[in-house]
Structure formats: structure tokens, C-alpha cells
Amino acid sequence: MRGTRAAQRYAKAILSLAKDKNSAEAVNEDMISISKTVVNSRDLENMLTSPVIKDSTKKSALLEIFKDLNTITKGAIDILLENGRIGILHLVARQYIIKFNELNNVRQAVVTTAVPLDKELEAVILSKVKELTGSEASLKSVIDEDIIGGFVLRVGDLQYDASVSRNLRRLERELKDNTYVSKI
């Protein structure tokens, strides 16, 4: 993906400054908000990457959308605008979140289910992930009706697949491989 290396460098610098100013948590909240908003708004992403729209317009739009930004986050937006890199703002935000979580030993857990999870079940899953990994986790929920039922949990490079579709595939494979012929 274009701009990923630059996004990592900007995120690292922003995190370093935020740690020095004891604002890493507040900046992380800003970055979560920025990441979600830009990813969910194609128009905003197009505006940020457009070479036709002036930087002053981009800045005023961002400050209008994100009214309560930390001064460090506002400064990061200014630097990205000055350097002509505002188009990678969402990548910088995503990289900041990743680096912040690494710093605080928080792992990303992705749970895939056929139906949305309720808050109680999310809490149970998070406690199990913490129990298994020994570190805090943030949960990202993905809906995929193809798994039919059950869930697939991924934490880092570990995966636990308890989906109905996996069990059906396993059963199908066992039935095909079964060489037992009953005697009549």
C-alpha cells in the first residue's frame, strides 16, 4: 500500500512526542476517531487525497469535523499538510494505534461470527484472550455469514476456528476419506 512506510515514521514520531507530553492516551483516542471517520467516509478520503482542494480548505474541514483534537494531533495534521502528506492521514492514524497498542502490550483480537456479538459475549471473549495470551486485548468484530455459526478467533498469528462451516468441511473430508465398507 502506498505511503505505509511514511505513515509508520510519522506515527512513530507522533507517539514519541505524545509520550514525552504525557498525552499518548488522548492522541490515541483522536487517532481512533480519525481512522474510523476517514475509513467510513469515502468523500472525506477523496477530499484529503485530492490535489485540487487547497490545504487550507482541508485543514478547516478536518478541524470542523474533529473539534476536540489534542494539540499534538492538530500539530500532526499541520505537519502532514505542510509536507503534502495529508492523504495518508488515516494510515498514520492506523499506524499510531498499532504502535500505541504495542507500547501498552495490548493485542488485537479479531473475532468472526455469523451474527453480531452482544457486549456480554465480547467481555467473555476479551477475558479469555487475556487469560490465554497474558496481555490485554482490543476486540474487532467481523460479521461473515459464510461461517454459518460458531466463531473464528485470531490473535496475532494464532487462530482458533470453532465455526460450523469448518466442522462441516472436516466432516465432509472424513466421509470422503472413509474406506470402511460395511458388511451386509
Swiss-Prot record:
Keywords: ATP synthesis, Cell membrane, CF(1), Hydrogen ion transport, Ion transport, Membrane, Transport. Its main location: membrane. It is found in: Cell membrane. One of its GO terms (cellular component) is plasma membrane. The keyword Metal-binding does not apply. HAMAP family: ATP_synth_delta_bact. F(1)F(0) ATP synthase produces ATP from ADP in the presence of a proton or sodium gradient. F-type ATPases consist of two structural domains, F(1) containing the extramembraneous catalytic core and F(0) containing the membrane proton channel, linked together by a central stalk and a peripheral stalk. During catalysis, ATP synthesis in the catalytic domain of F(1) is coupled via a rotary mechanism of the central stalk subunits to proton translocation. This protein is part of the stalk that links CF(0) to CF(1). It either transmits conformational changes from CF(0) to CF(1) or is implicated in proton conduction. Belongs to the ATPase delta chain family. This is ATP synthase subunit delta. The lineage of its organism: Bacteria, Pseudomonadati, Bacteroidota, Flavobacteriia, Flavobacteriales. The gene is atpH.
